[in-house]
Amino acid sequence: MSLDPTPPRSDDGRLLWSRSEELTGFEALMWRVEADPRMRSTVVIVETLDLEPDWDRFVAATEWASRVVPRFRERIVTPFLGAGTPHWALDPDFDLHYHLRRLRLPEGAGTPGLFTLAEQIAMTPLDPSRPLWEATLVGGLPDGGAALVFKLSHVLSDGMGLAQLLAGLHSRSREPMTDKPQPPPPSGPPATLSHEVVRQVRSDLGLVGGAARSLLGVASSLVRPDRAVRDAVAYVVSARRVLSPPPAPPLPALAHRSPSWRFRTLDVPFAELRAAGKSVGGSVNDAYVAGLLGAFRRYSERRGEPLPPDRLMPVTLPVSIRREEHEPGGNHFAPARLSAPVGIADPAARVVDVRRRMKIALGEPALESVEIVSAWLARLPGAVVAGFGGGATKSNDLQASNIPGLRDDAFLAGAKIVRSYPFAPLPGCAAMIAMVTHGDTCCVAANLDAASFTDLAGFEQDLADGFAEVLALGRSRG
């Protein structure tokens, strides 16, 4: 999957990316559910580099990025007296020195040591009083290589938005660009009580206005009351499906949960994955999900839980609901809930069944109802919201995401980006697995709950085997 165009720039050279002062309802909900430490929305992107960048050049590049993308200098402000919704505001005490770190792996640690370090960085909470990101340059990888471990909050953006961001920030040349725009540091008035009151009133009016527009839509449909009733009933039934966990029971082998994360990766040739899906009338995403299900079936069976062919498992797949009017960045996705065919051993039949079920999930009339509900839930106390959010996600065995990536060579402070692994947060599920296409390689990044997966080496092999059997479809039928 290729990336959308690079975000446009303003006249002064800033990226037009995630500029709204307001959090969406879903973003506010993600922020509030962090009252439960197990619901933290930390994202870690690990980019491996062919060489170690010059530190001063890396610092200068990051300082430039903080001027081009003002969100890097903004923090989330909790409303006065705790009433109302949180919002973005410039951090008057922004300190780049705090956000940048430099580490070197011990001799012989290699790539496994890098991902162990990334796990520890991911499990360390971001400081909520500062802008929600940190960047760690890691040296000491084999053959003179290095890595960037970029940690940020999911509240900043979804996967598509982050892909747009990196497309706008990464260079296409190893040499320094002397003609890139140099906007001044962002500035703005300090937050005051009067500004806060006006902002909250505007936010509340927007929420009420949205509800009113929905009611007007219903009223106008009464010109055809028979159709209106059918559509209303269909929407309510659809919303119940969208907002409820999939009806499939979780796998017993993955029953336990903890706040501990473990990272595993897999590289898959993009052309082969696409050919595998196409060979049975499916897409890259269908083949990707089928490969994951094959891994879960193998893992469950090795743990003493053989699965019958009709066994299903609960899976959620975030799908983009971005529209043309949406500015790049931010969170614009909805959860497609799937009772996924984990018991099907034949990879071809599994891909076909995944495609059938995905079409049904994506065709839900109320797919975007999560955003409507989130806007109201975000007004509740954090502890209440955390309980609701955890209950809605902990029954999932797997959340899986497929993110577009950069197809051309990209560079960071003179170092070529070799691979990019997006480790998304674990919101109560056993596994969150994301895939980004970098060049001609699909980089699969698995964030696994350490209590759910007690045999990590075994699952790593299961993941490789699950994709291998799917990739074989493209070779045997090509």
Language-model segments: which ranges?
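Soluble acyl-CoA-dependent acyltransferase catalytic core bearing the H(X)4D motif
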Residues: 2-27, 35-37, 42-429, 433-464, ...
